[in-house]
């Protein structure tokens, strides 16, 4: 994982793997849920309603599922998944990967507007009122320099065991219960210590993540997508 969200999901899987020794556990990994609360696409809806410019990276590609599809995947995992099975959608890189800037264009076209691409956030803000009145929408698309972004979405690693034949549209990761019990306990102790002290910062949490996940590839830039425009 390259960001805190991905790392937290990986840590959750490790704890569930430990629980799988005493009860049946199945899981799901899936792409971004389109227009879910707090997402960049949810921000498109909010900005459109307020007649504000759209801002999005043009070099990040993502897979997207509808809320219904993501719910169905979780339900199928619960009903059909075996112990320690992790279900994920079979998606084609050529057919399903799309950039946020492409989604912004499709979103605006759907609402009857053309994209007017600006060279800066200030330009987009300054031209918003005049452009929108002519059915054009100011957008600022940029190359990524924000924390925790990855070029493409990945559902599994080269070290994981896959079953790609059981279902037509769903793949399955069939991992063994691989976890370090001592490190999991140390992680919990670290979290408990922070809570007891009633004071912590992001760096404290990141340090605990690195101790449990040596492969964690987080790079802090101090910039975040939700701060854009």
Kindly give the residue locations of the regions a language model identified.
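Conserved catalytic loop/helix region of short-chain dehydrogenase/reductase
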Residues: 1-2
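Catalytic tyrosine of NAD(P)H-dependent dehydrogenase/reductases that use a Tyr as the general acid/base
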Residues: 5
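Active-site helix of classical SDR
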Residues: 8
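Strand-loop microenvironment adjacent to phosphate/nucleotide-handling motifs in alpha/beta enzyme folds
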Residues: 14-229
